[in-house]
Amino acid sequence: MNILFVHQNCPGQYKHLAPALAARKGWDVRFLTRPGKPDVAGVTKAEYDLAREPGKQTHRYLTNLESAVLYGQAAAQAAEKMRQSGFVPDVIVGHAGWGETMYLKDVFPTARLLGYFEFYYRAYGSDVDFELDRKVTLDDRARIRTKNAAQFISLEAADWGVTPTLWQKAQLPREFHGKVSVIHEGFDTDIVKPLADAKVTLPSGVKLTKDDEVVTYVARNLEPYRGFPIFMQVAEEICRRRPNAHILIVGADGVSYGRSLPDGQTYREKALSEVEIDPARVHFLGRQPYEQYLTVLQISAVHVYLTYPFVLSWSMLEAMGCECLIVGSDTPPVREVIRDGENGLLVDFYDHLAIADRVDEVLDHDDRMAEIRKRARRTIERSYSLDKCLRDQIRMVENLAEGRRPGNVAVVPPAGQKAVGKSGTQRKKRGAGRTRAPAAAKRRG
């Protein structure tokens, strides 16, 4: 069996799947990627590079499409060299987000294509119209529709698609739902687990354990899409209410999604100019090595996870795997996993006082939260463990290699989950919910 993986940032979502297939006797597994990416055990790596960047005069609606065409062209040219050398894949497995999969079936017409579809953009019911007071214009709608062009081409070309959550599937055009399965990549629950004697020593020398009031927040970058400005208002309130609480913030100062601030200002700098916190108890840890990051989760008394309707962060699932008590935003990606009061707590994304109230609820009644923590862990073991997810991924590749299609194979959603539509996005008008107390009143409190 010949398998070709394609991802510009090897191994990407295929960290476990590629070596698992390569370990099979008689399977020839190749990986097509950009130069300088890591090797994968048992996998033969091939590289491509872009001929150029999108042109400066390109219409801004078309910048993403031109970039995708350049990626697709480069990947196809590299694939053609592989074909000329005698390698013809039975199955191609590739991420559709950058355009690499658009033309691969033109090189290998007999191959079956399994596409990974991470996020299909929508003007409404998703991230764009979630921002308070943002008016979605005709320009926005046209730009977003065009932004999906490369994914649409890849969707049409794919024999089978996969996406990690039901909500992400719901964003895809309905006519393609029949050939898209929902399978998460999963992670190792023997590593991501609670640890009773976990301890974090901060740069200041302060040592924290599970016995302390530790509130955690994690994001790749500290930015609005992951609720960072809201969380800083929560941090201010926690500092005022709870003199013994420590707040650990993991994440860098860049922008992964959305817009950057003018003049190079970071969202952390902006937030610190707007709130009053105790710097001795609010700790910015930056990005952490994976083991240290897990230790932060393992000592957490409350983990706050906020997100726009967008791709669900692994950090929330890993926090649940560590038996963290999640206080999460009541937005569709979070609701798909967390049921309020059962395996976590949900709250209005924009209501910082309600979020602080739920943090108080957990810290004041930790004895009542033990079963919620355990159910959070069980949710992960049942639906997101690497053992289960990798087994499902391998079965999907095998089915595709044997000529089956999603319509011929029963795909069971993760346990306890229900289909999530595009509606129901939580978005409130400014002024809805409670307002912040005046600073002077808070200081008197």
Where are the predicted features?
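A short, well-ordered alpha-helix in the C-terminal region of glycosyltransferases
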Residues: 354, 361, 368-383, 389-395
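Nucleotide-activated donor-binding/catalytic signature segment of Leloir-type glycosyltransferases, i.e.
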Residues: 251, 255, 260-287
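Aromatic "clamp/platform" in nucleotide-sugar-dependent glycosyltransferases that forms part
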Residues: 308
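Short hydrophobic beta-strand element within catalytic cores of glycosyltransferases
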Residues: 325-328
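Conserved acidic donor-binding segment of nucleotide-sugar-dependent glycosyltransferases
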Residues: 340-341, 345-352, 361-366
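N-terminal subdomain of nucleotide-sugar transferases
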Residues: 1-44, 427-429, 441-445
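Acceptor-binding helix/loop patch of EC 2.4 sugar-transfer enzymes
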Residues: 52-62, 110-149, 190-199, 252-262, ...
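Conserved donor-binding/catalytic core segment of Leloir-type glycosyltransferases
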Residues: 203-226, 232-237, 247-248
